[in-house]
Amino acid sequence: MIARIWSGESPLWRLLLPLSWLYGLVSGAIRLSYKLGFKRAWRAPVPVVVVGNLTAGGNGKTPVVIWLVEKLQQRGVRVGVVSRGYGGKAAAYPLLLTPETTTAKAGDEPVLIYQRTGAPVAVAPERAAAVKAILAAHNVQIIITDDGLQHYRLARDIEIVVIDGVRRFGNGWWLPAGPMRERASRLKTVDAAIVNGGVARAGEIPMQLTPGLAVNLRTGARCDVAQLSNIVAMAGIGHPPRFFATLEACGAHPQKCVPLADHQTLAPADVQALVGEGQTLVMTEKDAVKCRAFAEDNWWFLPVDARLSGEQPDKLLQHITSLVR
């Protein structure tokens, strides 16, 4: 229903316009207060790169963060990552991740980024506190913040927006009548716009999410996902249909697709109940970090990597590395 409202297919979005106007006024006033100097943002002693969205819902932001961290690491840059830690609840903040940190404490995306990149990761509702925790514990040269485009309390040097190339900006309205956190005109002020799927427009960087081999949660064994049979697909991400479409494109045809809420807590019994005798569970890598502790033999995940096209990605990386002292 929300997808139909935000796309404009359902006329119900008109009923929500008063709330959207209120959302837009408040969010605009917050941004203006920082722009005019009525409020002051905290500036880190190292460059800060924000990777965020203009819309609610999954746009492929976390794969972009992982891509950016890995590319900078390949250039010898010491990178730290901060996040709000959605879906997690720690006893105290900021929380600096360790190999033992669970998704229940840190959230699924920070744990995934930490496991994939090995970069220092810290979470806190106040992003500046997370940055300070990393700087106190690690000699990093640059900070990447996973989400937080609208978190103006943290000053930033580079802003990158990730856009779903198929859904774009829906009906163009602020939440809750539409998907927008900020209006599309905000694109004029960011340093780069990366478009996940669909067709990129002039000045935008095209990106595709490229699936790898399926990985068994218990053994680490790898195989072509099309070789798995009797698949039940599970996706607890911002836009589950994208994952299900990826499986179909890989030649894996799920018998059942189970969409879950983004950052949803997964209880062992609930996940186990999805899979019948002789069936194979295939999930996203983000779900896998929550399920690994209680995984069964026939549970697999399909990792995806961001692939950015054209000359612009190299120019963006050169621009970012030029800020590192």
Curated annotation (Swiss-Prot):
It is an enzyme of class 2 (transferase). One of its GO terms (cellular component) is plasma membrane. The keyword Transferase applies. InterPro entries: LpxK (IPR003758), P-loop_NTPase (IPR027417). Keywords: ATP-binding, Kinase, Lipid A biosynthesis, Lipid biosynthesis, Lipid metabolism, Nucleotide-binding, Transferase. Belongs to the LpxK family. It comes from Salmonella schwarzengrund (strain CVM19633). Its EC number is 2.7.1.130. NCBIfam families: lpxK. Disulfide bonds: none annotated. It comes from the Bacteria. The gene is lpxK. ATP binds at T55, A56, G57, G58, N59, G60, K61, T62. Signal peptide: none annotated. This is Tetraacyldisaccharide 4'-kinase. One of its GO terms (biological process) is lipid A biosynthetic process. PANTHER family: TETRAACYLDISACCHARIDE 4'-KINASE, TETRAACYLDISACCHARIDE 4'-KINASE, MITOCHONDRIAL-RELATED. GO terms for molecular function: ATP binding; tetraacyldisaccharide 4'-kinase activity. Pathway: Glycolipid biosynthesis; lipid IV(A) biosynthesis; lipid IV(A) from (3R)-3-hydroxytetradecanoyl-[acyl-carrier-protein] and UDP-N-acetyl-alpha-D-glucosamine: step 6/6. It catalyses: a lipid A disaccharide + ATP = a lipid IVA + ADP + H(+). Transfers the gamma-phosphate of ATP to the 4'-position of a tetraacyldisaccharide 1-phosphate intermediate (termed DS-1-P) to form tetraacyldisaccharide 1,4'-bis-phosphate (lipid IVA).
